[in-house]
UniProtKB/Swiss-Prot annotation:
SUPFAM superfamilies: Serum albumin-like. Keywords: Calcium, Cleavage on pair of basic residues, Copper, Disulfide bond, Lipid-binding, Metal-binding, Methylation, Phosphoprotein, Repeat, Secreted, Signal, Zinc. This is Albumin. The keyword Glycosyltransferase does not apply. Ca(2+) 2 binds at D37, D278, D282. GO terms for biological process: cellular response to calcium ion starvation; cellular response to starvation; negative regulation of mitochondrial depolarization. GO terms for molecular function: DNA binding; enterobactin binding; fatty acid binding; metal ion binding; pyridoxal phosphate binding; small molecule binding; toxic substance binding. The modification Phosphothreonine is found at T443, T445, T569. Plasma. It is found in: Secreted.
């Protein structure tokens, strides 16, 4: 890369990086500006999401009252921007509203202490009290009751959906939740007219639920990336992902979008939902206005209404790679000015490398691309200080192959195991693996994480070879982030803390490399853990599996060195015991008699 070309690129990148695509206007009343930009319907939806994500135990009706009051105030400010308090920031207005709730301390305890702070510390305090694992009952869809609610009051139905999802997922990407609420309403508009409502509704609700849970996990990872590793980490992630998806767009264009995408997500992660949604709409508008230079896959997206448009852009298919790309080695190994370019503008040079490498490797996971970029950076940092830098970094690309081989081999082995055992058996294998690695982690967390890790088989193993790596590693990043988020609240394992905090891009390799914890002191055998009742027979299959897997974790915590043969025998006997009692005329009586015998059996097998 010639120096004059690089300087031109640096100037363009620096300008785009600092400026982005948004205008940074100031307004007399921020809340009036957002209300006018978003419109009343979306404004009310976003305010409802904001309150629900902070006050997760509050009844829906209380939130509706708060939303109504904020909306009326916003309308006052639209009519007269100089009216009392209209010049206050949205953070201040929102925080004041929370702190005015009389029962705040009674229902939320320490959250009320935040009210003694000033902005922005008060808002940061509110964020720290969000609960990623709230004690809220699982929703069980009743098609007849739901259709009755939908037909009685569509607006309330829409609001309750936002409320229920937001309070269970306090970092859900708010404008995307508005999109899913539209899809949810559409499902009910169609299925509540059907003769068999359940047959129409239940598969569609389950399909939507999977998409919503994945969306929640993706946003939680983005927020964790920004909160724990800084904005630069998120920008690097976005640069790699967008370069893969839009390989025809030039580096400066991608950099502009990355800068503003970081702003949008930082706003949503910090609870600035109105500004986040407004800026996301502006970014979608910019991308569509410039789609000719960004991607050929956006036309269909750009013809859609706002929420569908933004969602469609985020999920857009990868564009074809330009045919005239030079080999990467030309600019990043063979060019004699590599060290000069690197030293003069490290971030731009490394960003260019990541952009060029990512657009050529749509089959790699983002984490792998970032690990490769880290190795390239470390090599230049070392070589550019030596007497003959070109000779030193001449073989840098050879260092990348082991980074690629490691996840490929791991995925191959695990997919073979998945094919052999099936999903439930594969989950059990992962439960054994992770309980031995980090037995200090709570049993519910180990079961949840292992079950989700096990889903990588059905999600990714049947995909074409060129899609497997990115599918598996990107999905595993979401699941391991869930483990890290839960563990941060109640840290019990130094190994988990180390893997979670040292490097975002090396999390998965760190967890994969963990060995069984030989320092762990086994738990005492608790008979109550292996006591079961008649309700086990009527549980849905997934809940029945969770009961069995919970027992498996507890078994391993008692006997961490149990052999595969011992565990297989115990699980086989357990299945036979459950089958016998669930087939008996009196389930409870059978469990009462056979249960103690089963416990004696377990202890004998593991002795």
């Amino acid at each position: 890369m010639k120096w004059v070309t690089f300087i031109s690129l640096l100037f363009l990148f620096s300008s785009a990086y600092s400026r982005g695509v948004f205008r940074r206007d100031t307004y007399k009343s921020e809340i009036a500006h957002r209300f006018k930009d978003l419109g009343e319907q979306y404004f009310k939806g976003l305010v409802l999401i904001a309150f629900s994500q902070h006050l997760q135990q509050c009844p829906y009706e209380e939130h509706v009252k708060l939303v109504r009051e904020v909306t009326e105030f916003a309308k006052t400010c639209v009519a007269d921007e100089s009216a009392e308090n209209c010049d206050k920031s949205i953070h201040t207005l929102f925080g004041d509203k929370l702190c005015a709730i009389p029962s705040l301390r009674e229902h939320y305890g320490d959250l009320a202490d935040c009210c003694e702070k000033e902005e922005p510390e008060r808002n940061e305090c509110f964020l720290q009290h969000k609960n990623d694992n709230p004690d809220i009952p699982k929703l069980k869809p009743d098609p007849v009751a739901l259709c009755a609610d939908f037909q009685e009051d569509e607006q309330k139905f829409w609001g309750k959906y936002l409320y229920e999802i937001a309070r269970r997922h306090p970092y859900f990407y708010a404008p995307e939740l508005l999109y899913y609420a539209i899809i949810y309403k559409d499902v009910f508009s169609e299925c509540c007219q059907a003769a068999d409502k359940a047959a129409c509704l239940l598969p569609k609700i389950e399909h939507l639920r999977e998409k919503v849970l994945t969306s929640a996990a993706k946003q939680r990872l983005k927020c964790a990336s920004i909160q724990k590793f800084g904005e630069r980490a998120f920008k690097a992630w976005s640069l790699a992902r967008l370069s893969q998806r839009f390989p025809k767009a030039d580096f400066t264009e991608i950099s502009k979008i990355v800068t503003d995408l970081a702003k949008v997500h930082k706003e949503c992660c910090h609870g600035d939902l109105l500004e986040c949604a407004d800026d996301r709409a502006d970014l979608a508008k910019y991308i569509c206005e410039n789609q000719d230079t960004i991607s050929t896959k956006l036309k269909e997206c750009c013809d859609k209404p706002l929420l569908e448009k933004s969602h469609c852009i985020a999920e857009a298919k990868r564009d074809e790679l330009p045919a005239d790309l030079n080999p990467l080695e030309h600019d990043f190994v063979e060019d004699k000015e590599v060290c000069k370019n690197y030293k003069e503008a490290k971030h731009v040079f490394l960003g260019t490398f990541l952009y060029e490498y990512s657009r050529r490797h749509p089959d790699y996971s983002v984490s792998l691309l970032l690990r490769i970029a880290k190795i390239y950076e470390a090599t230049l940092e070392d070589c550019c200080a030596k007497e003959d830098p070109p000779a030193c970094y001449a073989t840098v690309f050879d260092k990348f192959q082991p980074l690629v081989d490691e996840p490929k081999n791991l995925i191959k082995q695990n997919c073979e195991l998945f094919e052999k055992l099936g999903e439930y058996g594969f989950q059990n294998a992962l439960i054994v693996r992770y309980t031995k690695k980090v037995p200090q982690v709570s049993t519910p967390t180990l079961v949840e994480v292992a079950r989700k890790l096990g889903l990588v088989g059905s999600r990714c193993c049947k995909r074409p070879e060129e899609e497997r790596l990115s599918c598996a590693e990107d999905y595993l990043s979401l699941v391991l982030n869930r483990l890290c988020v839960l563990h941060e609240k109640t840290p019990v394992s130094e190994k988990v803390t180390k893997c979670c905090t040292e490097s975002l891009v090396n999390r998965r390799p760190c967890f994969s490399a963990l060995t069984p914890d030989e320092t762990y002191k086994p738990k005492e055998f608790v008979e109550g853990t292996f006591t079961f009742h008649a309700d086990l027979c009527t549980l849905p299959e997934d809940e029945k599996q969770i009961k069995k897997q919970t027992a498996l974790v507890e078994l391993l915590k008692h006997k961490p060195h149990a052999t595969e043969e011992q565990l297989r025998t115990v699980l086989g006997n357990f299945a036979a015991f459950v089958q016998k009692c669930c087939a008996a005329p009196d389930h409870e009586a059978c469990f009462a008699v056979e249960g103690p015998k089963f416990v004696i059996e377990i202890r004998g097998i593991l002795a």
